[in-house]
């Protein structure tokens, strides 16, 4: 009982201490306009240092990563079919594919896969 209470207290205190230390170390003094502006050989910059980024491209990249991970998770299925219960493996894989298909249909209807607009 005492060991559980002690481990719970440690589990609560360690993240609080780490967050507190990060907050103290990350706090900055008053921001100076010159310090926060980009530096270009001592002169004012000719253009902005921030390049605009298309959020549609970012969303499409995230969708690609999700479906790429799907393929990685489906690759061992032929090997698993030989070593385990076929019904359980097929049921699990069909459920997995149905969830991903529902996600794909949702993305399609939402227009996230339409690059032209």
Curated annotation (Swiss-Prot):
It catalyses: a ubiquinone + NADH + 5 H(+)(in) = a ubiquinol + NAD(+) + 4 H(+)(out). GO terms for molecular function: NADH dehydrogenase (ubiquinone) activity. Its main location: mitochondrion. It holds the Pfam family Oxidored_q4. Keywords: Electron transport, Membrane, Mitochondrion, NAD, Respiratory chain, Translocase, Transmembrane, Transmembrane helix, Transport, Ubiquinone. The chain crosses the membrane at residues 5-25, 57-77, 86-106. Its EC number is 7.1.1.2. GO terms for cellular component: mitochondrial membrane; NADH dehydrogenase complex. It is an enzyme of class 7 (translocase). It is a multi-pass membrane protein. It is found in: Mitochondrion membrane. InterPro entries: NADH_UbQ/plastoQ_OxRdtase_su3, NDAH_ubi_oxred_su3_sf. Belongs to the complex I subunit 3 family. Core subunit of the mitochondrial membrane respiratory chain NADH dehydrogenase (Complex I) that is believed to belong to the minimal assembly required for catalysis. Complex I functions in the transfer of electrons from NADH to the respiratory chain. The immediate electron acceptor for the enzyme is believed to be ubiquinone. This is NADH-ubiquinone oxidoreductase chain 3.
């Amino acid at each position: 009982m005492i060991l559980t209470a002690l481990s719970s207290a440690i589990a609560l205190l360690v993240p609080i201490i780490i967050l507190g230390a990060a907050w103290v170390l990350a706090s900055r003094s008053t921001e100076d306009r010159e310090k926060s502006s980009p530096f270009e050989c001592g002169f004012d910059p000719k253009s902005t240092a921030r390049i605009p980024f298309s959020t549609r491209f970012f969303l499409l990249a995230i969708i690609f990563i999700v479906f790429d991970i799907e393929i990685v998770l489906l690759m061992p299925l032929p090997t698993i079919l030989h070593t385990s219960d076929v019904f359980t493996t097929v049921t699990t894989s069909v459920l997995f594919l149905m969830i991903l298909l529902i996600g794909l249909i949702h993305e399609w209807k939402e227009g996230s896969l339409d690059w032209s607009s």
